């Protein structure tokens, strides 16, 4: 299956080499550019095949042919949560070795086209197959879905959600879409907005008002399952300095009661447990989050038996079309039950 990308160089673009444009502006990898060079009419400028060393100018029309059929698995590395994931579930839907899903969950599809699949992950399900969840991950469900449709697709989740977190997960259906959606330099980078219920009372914010938490994180040296803020660690240790990662969270309070508050969050970075650690550091941990708060009252609030976090909305430019996609996952049952206790009309948010 061939994919074509077309770009019209605007008047504000300064003269630059074709290869530099394809890397910086088109978000293509060195490997993808190299593969395109050797295809007939793989890279053209104004309809004429050209070299990547040529200079492009304002007004030029660039077309790149990117081929998926016959290529090997992308072997992409996932940096979404600040950890290089070697177990990215990049198995093929028609491959005999791809484990069959053994879960009672059904796949809730929010959006699908020839390049992208977006689904609503339930809380309690892992995104990628792991040793303990080799056949009951979200990726297993997606592989089974493609297999039933007789679609030969490599399963490539773009980022991941923690097991306890519900909400939107985007899957790329081809190698090029995956690299464009995952690249931090690409205009197609996915922007997520989360919904969380936290302990305690936070002042409700006016529209457009956001609060920023700029707290670097690293793995807790005493518990590898947890993350900690740099403020909790010795910054004078050279052994730790290289392990500390920048982490920036923005939050906005939608509703507040005497015991809990409903907030929405956006991330500049995507570190492991970033929202959970940052909110715990403010004294307002997520309801149900026993890993970062041991108070029994927190875990027993309403019906939350998990960290109250939901990947609510995503927005991104389509990797092959001049179209902005805005997707939203409905509130899961535990969030709806909690919101109903507030007596406010928050279900319409």
Whereabouts are the PLM-identified features?
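RNA pseudouridine synthases
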Residues: 1-349
């Amino acid at each position: 299956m061939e994919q074509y990308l077309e770009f019209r160089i605007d008047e504000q673009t300064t003269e630059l080499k074709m290869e530099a444009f394809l890397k910086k502006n088109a978000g293509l990898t060195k490997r993808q550019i190299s593969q395109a060079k050797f295809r007939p009419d793989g890279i053209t400028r104004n309809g004429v095949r050209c070299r990547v060393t040529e200079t492009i100018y304002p007004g030029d029309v660039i077309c790149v042919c990117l081929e998926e059929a016959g290529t090997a698995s992308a072997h992409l590395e996932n940096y979404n949560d600040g950890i290089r994931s070697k177990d990215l579930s990049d198995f093929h839907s028609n491959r005999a070795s791809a484990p069959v899903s053994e879960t009672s969950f059904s796949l809730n599809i929010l959006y699908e086209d020839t390049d992208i699949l977006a689904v609503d992950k339930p809380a309690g399900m892992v995104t990628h197959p792991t040793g303990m969840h080799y056949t009951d991950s979200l990726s297993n469900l997606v592989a089974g879905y493609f297999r039933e449709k007789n679609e030969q697709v490599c399963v490539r989740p773009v980022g991941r959600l923690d097991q306890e977190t519900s909400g939107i997960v985007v899957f790329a259906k081809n190698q090029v879409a995956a690299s464009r959606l995952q690249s931090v330099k690409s205009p197609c980078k996915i922007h997520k907005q989360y919904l969380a219920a936290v302990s305690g009372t936070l002042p409700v914010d006016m529209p457009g008002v956001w609060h920023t938490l700029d707290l670097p994180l690293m793995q807790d040296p005493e518990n590898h399952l947890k993350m900690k803020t740099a403020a909790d660690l010795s910054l004078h240790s050279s052994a730790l300095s290289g392990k500390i990662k920048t982490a920036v969270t923005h939050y906005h309070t939608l509703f507040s009661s005497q015991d809990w508050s409903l907030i929405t969050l956006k991330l500049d970075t995507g570190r492991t447990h970033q929202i959970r650690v940052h909110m715990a550091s403010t004294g307002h941990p997520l309801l149900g989050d026993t890993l970062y708060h041991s108070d029994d009252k927190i875990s027993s609030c309403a019906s939350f038996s998990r960290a109250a976090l939901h990947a609510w909305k995503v927005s991104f430019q389509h990797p092959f079309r001049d179209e902005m996609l805005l997707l939203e996952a409905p509130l899961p049952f535990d969030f709806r039950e909690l919101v109903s206790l507030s007596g406010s009309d928050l279900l319409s948010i």
